[in-house]
Each structure stands twice: as C-alpha cells, then as structure tokens.
C-alpha cells in the first residue's frame, strides 16, 4: 500500500490540501505542518521516505538540504525545477554529496501546448545524511551549501 505525506510550513496550504483530500475521497495521505528544516529533525520523519518530491521553491542546493534528510538510504529525491537546470545542478554537486546523495538523472521537457521548459532532477540517496543537516531554519536558503 502506498502512503503519502504532504509537508508544508503554512497551515493555510495544508487546510486547502486537507479539503482536496476529503472532497476527492483520497486515502493514505496525511498532511504534516513543519518547516522542512524542523521536520527533518523529527525521528518519525527523518530518513523514513522512499521518495521525496519537491516543487520549485529554492535553488537545488537548498532543496537538497530541505529534502534529502527525509529520504531513506536507497530512496530518491525528485526536484521539480524550471527550465534547463544543468547549471544549477552543477552548483549543487557539493551539497548533494554532503547530504548523502548522487545525481542520477535529469529529465527535461516542455509543458504541454507551450514552449515552457521544466526539469525533473533525480537524486539517489546512497548514504545517511549527517545529523548536522539540515541546518537551523533559514540558513539553507540564506547560505546554500556550495
């Protein structure tokens, strides 16, 4: 059985998602209210997920610090990015490595009926993430690992 958890720092978004889940009759989905940096320090969430997917909310280094601590060793992190993210991926190599990951693939595509490019960057988790990551709230975005 597939279980899904939706994490967000804003209750407003989670309330909306809970309404959608209820109206559509979706099962095995929970919403979790934490900042990414804080939730990843909770034993019940840290390195518990086979796959973590993010929307494009930050640069790749920051997204890795937000998301890789949630991924089990052997699992994957999929980052949704705008455009061709190759330069951003190159800048994030150190962060990916420090957090226990390795870039596995990047899939580039255009949104249907448009010429708007997007990317899915797939990072495989090879080693546990050090307990020092993620750093305290705000630091991953202010001072990305480079």
Locate each region found by the language model.
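Short SAM/SAH-binding signature in class I
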Residues: 47-56
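Short alpha-helix immediately C-terminal to the canonical SAM-binding loop
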Residues: 13-15, 85, 89
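Short, small-residue-biased leader/transition segments that mark boundaries at the very start
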Residues: 1-2
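SAM/dcSAM-binding transferase cores
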Residues: 90-146
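Conserved beta-strand signature within the Rossmann-like core of class I S-adenosyl-L-methionine
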Residues: 74-87
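Helix-to-beta-strand junctions that scaffold the AdoMet/dcAdoMet cofactor pocket
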Residues: 26, 71-73
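A short, conserved alpha-helix within the catalytic core of class I
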Residues: 58-67
């Amino acid at each position: 059985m597939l279980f899904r958890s939706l994490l967000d720092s804003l209750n407003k978004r989670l309330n909306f998602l809970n309404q959608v889940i209820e109206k559509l009759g979706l099962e095995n989905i929970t919403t979790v209210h934490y900042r990414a940096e804080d939730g990843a320090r909770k034993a019940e969430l840290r390195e518990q997920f086979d796959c973590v997917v993010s929307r494009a909310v930050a640069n790749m280094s920051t997204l890795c610090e937000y998301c890789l601590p949630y991924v089990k060793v052997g699992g994957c992190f999929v980052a949704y990015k705008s455009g061709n993210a190759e330069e951003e991926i190159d800048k994030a190599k150190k962060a990916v490595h420090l957090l226990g990951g390795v870039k596995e693939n990047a899939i580039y595509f255009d949104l249907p009926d448009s010429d708007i490019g997007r990317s899915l960057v797939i990072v495989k988790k090879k080693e546990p993430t050090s307990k020092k990551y993620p750093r305290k709230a705000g630091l991953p975005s202010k001072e990305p690992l480079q």
